[in-house]
Amino acid sequence: MQVHASLGRTHNPANVQRAVESVRSSGIPALNLDLIYGAVGETLDDWRYTVQQAVELSPTHVSAYGLTVEPGTPLALEPHRHPDDDDQADKYIIVDDILRSAGLANYEISNWAIPGFECRHNLLYWRQGDYTGFGCAAHSHADGRRWWNVRTPERYIEAVDTNSPTEASGETLDVATRKREALELSLRTSDGVPVGALDPKTLDGLVEVVGERIVLTQRGRLLGNEVSLRLLP
């Protein structure tokens, strides 16, 4: 509860339990839990207990993300509350070990699932599929072009009411950018990339060859940003 309060969250574990019971009683077979780690004041034991409690709810899918500080937020103005990289790395290893032991496979850096319950929505992003976003600030992608809608509900509603474009801006990706992004996104997943798509020596210790694929090691998953930087031309 103390960690929740530090992040401005008003829900509590009892709310989570009630929500899960509601999903189960409705006959919905798939259940995802979103977890965030790295808040100041959260010990390794606190985090381990959180993950163990999550496993006891028998989710079919878990997303676990390290806390990030966005510019312009109240947290950004308090550097002493910013997450510590080493602490986040330790907590990633904890969640990875516990979820794998519970039968949830890591199929993308921050996502674990019972086989067959991987998130198709997210897989579409990682495979550079096409999608259309509706609503304020929603993003879309088609044929190598990305665009996003106006940010505020008021502007979006006004645009719809006046039959005006809802798009705020966009960009068309060149061939080189699309290829690099395809490589980066594929490497985030457990499928990795085909042998020959890159030289493993450029990512020494961050990737390994498994059969005919090159996949991230656990260290590579911890250093995803470093992997992306090394793939830059």
PLM regions and their residue ranges:
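Short amphipathic alpha-helical interaction segments
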Residues: V195-G205
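Minor-groove-contacting beta-hairpin "wing" of winged helix-turn-helix DNA-binding domains
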Residues: R213-T217
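C-terminal scaffold of the Radical SAM
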Residues: M1-G196
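Short, amphipathic alpha-helical interaction segments positioned at domain boundaries
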Residues: R219-P233
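A short, conserved structural fragment
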Residues: D204-E212
